[in-house]
Curated annotation (Swiss-Prot):
Organism of provenance: Elephantid herpesvirus 1 (isolate Asian elephant/Berlin/Kiba/1998)
Pfam families: Herpes_V23
HAMAP family xrefs: HSV_TRX2
Protein name listed in UniProt: Triplex capsid protein 2
Keyword terms, alphabetized: Capsid protein, Host nucleus, Virion
Gene Ontology cellular component list: host cell nucleus; viral capsid
Subunit and interaction comment: Interacts with TRX1 and major capisd protein/MCP.
InterPro entries: Herpes_capsid_2
Function recorded in the entry: Structural component of the T=16 icosahedral capsid. The capsid is composed of pentamers and hexamers of major capsid protein/MCP, which are linked together by heterotrimers called triplexes. These triplexes are formed by a single molecule of triplex protein 1/TRX1 and two copies of triplex protein 2/TRX2. Additionally, TRX1 is required for efficient transport of TRX2 to the nucleus, which is the site of capsid assembly.
Gene name as annotated: TRX2
Any one GO molecular function term: structural molecule activity
Length: 292
């Protein structure tokens, strides 16, 4: 399928036409990737509450299909679904500049819902996500987790510290992410804490068992330092009590530990959707390879 068309039920006003023509090249998420869709399937509007729930928007965005808005044709938006490995010219709708070689991720609007709301009607708003370098997306996810965790044991009036955690500076831009608290974010914090507790419980015995062997086999200074640190820890036993290792049990423990580490990483890591190949002088448009 080469095109997805969003058909408007009523004639667009000249003002709306002008607004849409200004965002040609924008990445527009759609709920259904079919030849004809309605406005309610386009953008993030139906997932936005008065509290601008970032967790809810993030989850919804991950379930949608990214398209590129190509043109306005009569009373309909014409969009192109993206395919892995293809090259697209996309618009920078976020606050941060891009550079050639950047890997870009798509995230919900985090600095101003109004800024990413392109047009408004009585029944529907066109709200777009923002495209940022993956390191920015990762930092935003980390800060959201930190803010949520801090909110559990700090008073709401602790503004100064909150603002410090909320502020993100990248290249020549500084933004403040919203300090909202929602149940999905709390679930993420709870699950991360559980995973870290299990990692803390399982990792020491595995490290105590295998790092000394690696230190004997290798002369790498990092391994030697790890061995020295482990000798200072007050750990019970010697890893397996002198008994031959139970292979199935060892595999289960190692697999479980690595899965937990992978889970913690997945909470904050964003998938790279684009690699920037070329950028216009004003940094508003870029030619990118779609990598998802």
């Amino acid at each position: 399928m080469n095109e997805v068309k969003c058909v408007f039920e009523t004639k667009l006003s000249p003002g709306d036409v002008a607004k849409l023509n200004k965002i040609v090249g924008a990445v527009v998420p759609v709920a259904r990737c079919t030849p004809l869709i309605s406005p309610r399937d386009v953008g993030l509007h139906k997932h936005v509450s008065h509290r601008t729930d970032y967790g809810k928007l993030h989850m919804a965005l991950n379930m949608m299909y990214p398209t590129v808005f190509r043109k306005l044709e009569g009373n309909q938006m014409v969009m192109t679904p993206m395919q892995h490995g293809n090259i697209y010219t996309i618009r920078n709708t976020g606050p941060f500049s891009w550079e050639v070689g950047d890997r870009l991720a798509i995230i919900p609007p985090v600095f101003s819902v109004e800024h990413t709301t392109i047009m408004q009607t009585p029944s529907w708003d066109l709200m777009l996500p923002i495209i940022v370098p993956v390191q920015v997306a990762k930092e935003i996810n980390i800060r959201n987790l930190v803010l949520t965790l801090m909110s559990l044991n700090r008073p709401g009036r602790d503004v100064e510290l909150s603002q410090e955690v909320r502020r993100i500076h990248f290249r020549d831009v500084t933004i403040d992410i919203p300090a909202t608290l929602d149940t999905r974010q709390l679930n993420s914090v709870r699950n991360v804490c559980l995973a870290l507790a299990l990692i803390t419980n399982v990792a020491p015995s595995l490290l105590q068992q295998y790092v000394p062997r690696l230190a004997l086999a290798e002369t790498d200074m990092l391994l030697v330092k790890c061995y020295d640190l482990l000798k200072k820890l007050d750990l019970p036993g010697d890893g397996n009590g002198g008994e031959p290792p139970n292979i199935p049990n060892e595999i289960q423990r190692m697999s479980g530990l690595l899965n937990l580490i992978t889970y913690v990483s997945s909470i904050v890591t964003e998938n790279s959707l684009f690699i920037v190949n070329d950028i216009t002088p004003d940094n508003k448009m870029a030619t990118c390879t779609f990598t998802l």
